[in-house]
């Protein structure tokens, strides 16, 4: 069972509870988000991140249920924080009427890369971060929420989401959610784990 207590919140959510299966159900505060300057001209530094130190020799995976993403910019995944001006968030965000898999890399100012994943709705989504040399590699995949199907190994191959320069040894990482435009957005986090790092960029992660 996942030890959710090993992390601390960057901002306390509206509500946090463990369900019968040991998943962490979290409700975002309305208006919570992370973004710095680019295009929109504002700064939001009050998203919800459950963070622990990131060991340099480990990859980190966060899994959540992609359900109930109905508000514009509802989002969940993982976040890596060095400081207020240096961070990466990656996961699924509801934007322009579609769930979008993407990443925001912030070094002073934010950028955003994204693409639709409508077929992932109602599935478990895993977002993975691993260091390779001076970079962080973000990957993601989905699998059925049904426990029997998940146990059978059914699921998507890993998708490469982002390769970003990341020379930092000291960072914190963990599950993330934000509800920029509405109250009541809840995310069911299924797992948060450390695992073996990627061996190379153009090969699947270790099983």
Task: Describe the residue ranges of each PLM region.
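Extracellular glycan-recognition regions
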Residues: 1-207
């Amino acid at each position: 069972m996942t030890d959710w207590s090993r992390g601390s919140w960057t901002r306390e959510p509206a509500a946090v509870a463990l369900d019968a299966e040991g998943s962490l159900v979290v409700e975002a505060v309305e208006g919570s988000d992370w973004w710095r300057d680019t295009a929109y001209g504002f700064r939001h530094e009050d998203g919800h991140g459950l963070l622990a130190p990131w060991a340099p020799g480990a990859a980190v995976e966060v899994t959540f249920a992609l359900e109930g993403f109905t508000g514009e910019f509802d989002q969940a995944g993982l976040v890596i924080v060095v400081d207020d001006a240096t961070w990466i968030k990656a996961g699924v965000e509801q934007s322009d009427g579609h769930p979008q898999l993407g990443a925001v890399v912030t070094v002073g100012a934010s950028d955003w890369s994204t693409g639709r994943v409508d077929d992932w709705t109602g599935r478990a989504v895993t977002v993975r971060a691993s260091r390779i040399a001076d970079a962080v590699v973000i990957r993601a995949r989905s699998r059925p929420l049904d426990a029997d199907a998940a146990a059978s190994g059914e699921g998507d191959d890993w998708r490469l989401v982002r390769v970003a320069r990341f020379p930092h040894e000291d960072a914190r990482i963990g599950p993330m959610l934000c509800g920029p435009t509405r109250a009541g957005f809840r995310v069911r986090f299924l797992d948060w784990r450390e695992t073996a790092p990627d061996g190379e960029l153009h090969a699947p992660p270790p099983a």
